Design a protein with these regions (language model features):
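N-terminal localization/anchoring segments of enzymes in phospholipid and broader phosphate metabolism
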Residues: 1-533, 551-555, 565-589, 593-697
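Glycine/threonine-rich ATP-lid/beta-loop region of ATP-binding domains
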Residues: 543-550
């Protein structure tokens, strides 16, 4: 395939990301979702967009500068950025429309978002008290028209840009003042719930509470007119390291985290009603220039806070409660290590509880036959029970080794703190490998009667395990367990070059193995044997993998994909990808599993692991896929993919067009895969309970 042909059949990764985030925005307008969950989708959309500008748009800006120095006209990055900004402009207008629609829907439920001009006298009295008793001493206005030192502003915060003047001109005090007030959302909720009046629940943005209090805040200035407009800016958050400096990885990452405060602005968002003089003054203060992205928006920004909208006691406006379903085998066992030795086990979070994994670590920490525990760590919960179990094991005399990836984006500081705590407890901590991110999710437990290993698709993080769908395989299969230990040997001694027969490991072998697996399907299709690929993954953007999938499609291989995020592959193109279908599911849980099933001529091969089909995962990270041999677990993986492909409520067609049409045919019975999967697991658990009772009686 020539470069020109590739460009025709591959969507740019950043544009495909915009299409993905649009699917989240679409769920905010999806009336099958409960009302307060639709607000949450707006928050998720906003949060994602912030990070996208911090990393990807900032990177595009640097690439444009580089390309302009080489080829000044029509750089490719410039075209991509132009397309992104046009999509962002369109999506921003849709976001505002959806938000206003949801406000109207809230009013039908007697929930009102009121501003500073819409309060009743009793509500004003309540806000007065809140300001004087709690809020006042957390507000530190900067009179920017008088300041002598340039302020260090936080791009994670939102600010009110305030213009202070007089309604009637005074000879002695006719000077306008400009001020900035950081809205203290780190200390207070973004939303202030007013006392209930009858059946009405009234809620204010903290921004509006502060607007109401401006006469109190600036009382000493002797002005009587206050205009306040929300602004937000985003800095370049990519970290750069001086590899010539003689510093430890820990020191380099610590410096990199601090340097984010000095990153150049890449986006400036402001209220479209802001007066031109205040806008110019603010731009000058923040050093915003014409090259930075300007987003002219509505009254409120940083709406990621909608994720934490007040918990109103209206259960019908939220998702139905889905408590984790117990794993029957775990319930019936007092020794998980012995259980796993007898038969491979799965936990599928959040359908099953992550507590099962913590239980395994806790049991290992006190089990006399356990000698050592090794684990790879990418992201951790704020109060990590995983770390507590590892520390417990170390204190009980076990040899504990933790591979901690310091460069897990935006979790660097947290991982540095945890690494320090573990070292203080006597745990051997290895801070990754220079030049390679350790993204694999592995644990290895050495025990006298036989070792076991855990291989996961997601982080060992009890927080995200309640909202991310992830599998963890627990196995005593000797070939797999020994090779997991070999991965840890490599992480401890990167000069080693281990070989693998069971695991698919990046960066050494994964790309080559994936290409080989796809080629086998191509060969089988040509020979008339069963040939198909079923895959559930987060992102597909690697051009070489996509090219091989196109070849497979042309050879007659049926390819069905569930792709949550970026998808650079274009489906349904005649003589190119007509045998490829792709769906993206956005629902109450974030789809995070990576599962691969290959027909293999009728003897299916099953894999799960940590890697997406991206250049970074295949060539620049330590990633692991494991085969799944247990037939019961294979059936479970197949069910997950089949349910996803059948979804016609939250699954959208991912074909490269960005239309994101729902995967629905007229007169179909609604099938929501996450809901159906939960019910499936629940029925299986209840059925197993009934069978046990029958045996007892």
């Amino acid at each position: 395939m020539t470069i020109k042909e590739k460009n025709n059949y591959i969507v740019n990764r950043d544009i495909s990301w915009m299409y993905f985030n649009r699917r989240i925005l679409d769920e905010a307008s999806n009336e099958t979702n409960p009302l307060l969950e639709r607000l949450s989708f707006l928050g998720i959309y906003s949060s994602n967009l912030d990070e996208f500008f911090q990393i990807r748009v900032a990177t595009l800006g640097r690439m444009i500068e580089l390309e302009e120095n080489m080829h000044p006209i029509n750089t490719n990055s410039k075209k991509v950025l132009k397309k992104i900004l046009k999509l962002n402009e369109d999506y921003t207008l849709d976001f505002e429309t959806i938000f206003m629609d949801l406000k109207s829907e809230l009013q039908k439920e007697n929930i009102f978002l009121v501003n500073e001009l819409e309060m009743t006298p009793s509500q004003e009295k309540c806000v007065d008290s809140f300001y004087r008793e709690e809020l006042m001493n957390s507000l530190f206005p900067i009179l920017v028209s008088r300041m002598s030192v340039e302020p260090k502003l936080n791009d994670k915060s939102i600010y009110l840009a305030v213009k202070i003047s007089n309604t009637v001109k005074h000879e002695k005090n006719d000077k306008k003042e400009y001020a900035l007030i950081e809205i203290p959302t780190g200390e207070f909720s973004r939303f202030f719930v007013l006392p209930k009046e009858g059946e009405k629940t009234c809620i204010m943005f903290l921004d509006d509470v502060i607007r109401y209090c401006l006469p109190y805040i600036f009382a000493q200035l002797n002005h009587d007119k206050y205009e306040a407009y929300t602004i937000k800016f985003t800095r370049d958050a990519e970290m750069e390291f001086d590899n010539t400096a003689y510093e430890s990885v820990l020191e380099k990452v610590s410096k990199g985290v601090k340097s984010r405060r000095d990153g150049l602005p890449v986006r400036f968002v402001f209220d479209r009603e802001i007066p031109s003089d205040l806008l110019r003054f603010t731009e000058k203060l923040l050093k915003i220039d014409k090259r930075d992205v300007h987003v002219c928006g509505a009254r409120y920004h940083n709406l990621q806070d909608l994720i934490s909208f007040p918990k109103i006691r209206r259960s019908e406006l939220k998702y139905k409660n889905h408590p984790p379903i117990p794993v029957r085998a775990f319930e019936d066992s007092i020794n998980l290590i012995s259980l796993i030795r007898k038969k491979d086990q799965f936990i599928h979070c959040p359908y099953n509880s992550f507590d099962n994994f913590i239980r395994l670590l806790r049991e290992s920490a006190i089990n006399p036959e356990v000698k050592a525990i090794k684990i790879s760590i990418y992201r951790l919960a704020k109060n990590s029970k995983v770390i507590m179990a590892l520390i417990c094991a170390a204190l009980n005399g076990k040899k504990v080794t933790a591979i901690v990836e310091l460069l897990a984006r935006f979790d660097e500081s947290s991982n540095i703190n945890w690494a320090t705590k573990m070292r203080d407890a006597g745990i051997k901590v290895i801070l990754g490998i220079e030049g390679l991110k350790v993204h694999s999710k592995l644990a290895h437990i050495t025990a006298r009667k036989g070792n076991i290993a855990c291989i996961g698709t997601g982080n060992f993080h009890e927080g995200t395990a309640t909202v991310y769908t992830d599998f963890t395989l627990m196995t005593a299969h000797k070939g797999i367990v020994d090779e997991v230990e070999s991965v840890f040997d490599f992480l401890e001694q990167p000069y080693l070059n281990p070989t693998f027969k069971q695991l698919i490991v990046a960066p050494q072998y994964m790309r080559k193995k994936l290409i080989s697996l796809i080629k086998t399907e191509i060969d089988n299709a040509k020979e008339g044997k069963p040939a198909y690929i079923l895959c559930k993954i987060n992102h597909i953007v690697d051009s070489k993998i996509i090219e091989k999938l196109y070849q497979a499609s042309n050879a007659g291989v049926v390819i069905k994909l569930l792709v949550r995020g970026n998808c650079s592959l274009i489906t349904g193109v005649p003589k190119q990808s007509e045998n490829i279908e792709a769906l993206g599911i956005i629902d109450r849980y974030l789809e995070h599993c990576r599962i691969m099933i290959f027909a293999n001529g009728g003897e299916e091969r099953y894999f799960l692991g940590s890697a997406d089909w991206m250049l970074r995962n295949l060539d620049f990270r330590v990633e692991v896929y494991t085969p799944v041999y247990d037939t019961d677990l294979q059936k479970q993986l197949k069910t997950v993919i089949e349910f996803g492909l059948k979804d016609n409520v939250t699954a959208r067609i991912v074909d490269g067009s960005g239309k994101n049409l729902i995967n629905y045919t007229a007169n179909e019975t609604p099938f929501r895969s996450q809901e159906e999967l939960y019910n499936f697991y629940k029925r299986n658990y209840e059925y197993s309970f009934i069978e046990i009772e029958k045996q007892i009686t």
